[in-house]
Amino acid sequence: GPMVFKGYWNLPEDTAYTFRGGWHHTGDLGRFDEDGFLWYEGRKAEKELIKPGGENVYPAEVERAILEHPAVDQTVVFGVPDPTWKEGIKAVCILKEGHELDHRELIAFVSQHIASYKKPRYVDFVDEFPLLEDGSPDRAKIKELYGGPQE
């Protein structure tokens, strides 16, 4: 509330958009599991929205599908330039120790769990992610490292 946060400095439009109807709309997504626990699922921020062929795809949904694969330990999903779809979906993944997987296998697996237009078109496998101070993946740095033109 206003005792903690009055708004964004010199950004009245952003402040008005974020504070609506007496609520602070953070853009955080969550879900309740069958035991009633609330799980953080990512952000529903416009800047994270990927639009392949004009469709709306949230990275958190694609990440959940990828993490269902038994060989995948961590993943970060983001949009990249794509010659066909204007924006393509890219996944950067860390595999669990002792597991092997190629991009075709992962894309086929994900296609069984989410709509075809939401599956990643590009996949990179890496050994580690750059991390933020809190230990979470540094999404901006990962996109900077792996988000250039795709082949």
Where are these regions (language model features)?
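Active-site loops of AMP-binding adenylate-forming
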Residues: L11-D14
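A structural signal for the hydrophobic beta-strands that form the central parallel beta-sheet
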Residues: H25-T26, Y40, F125
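AMP-binding/adenylate-forming catalytic domain of the ANL superfamily
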Residues: A115-S136
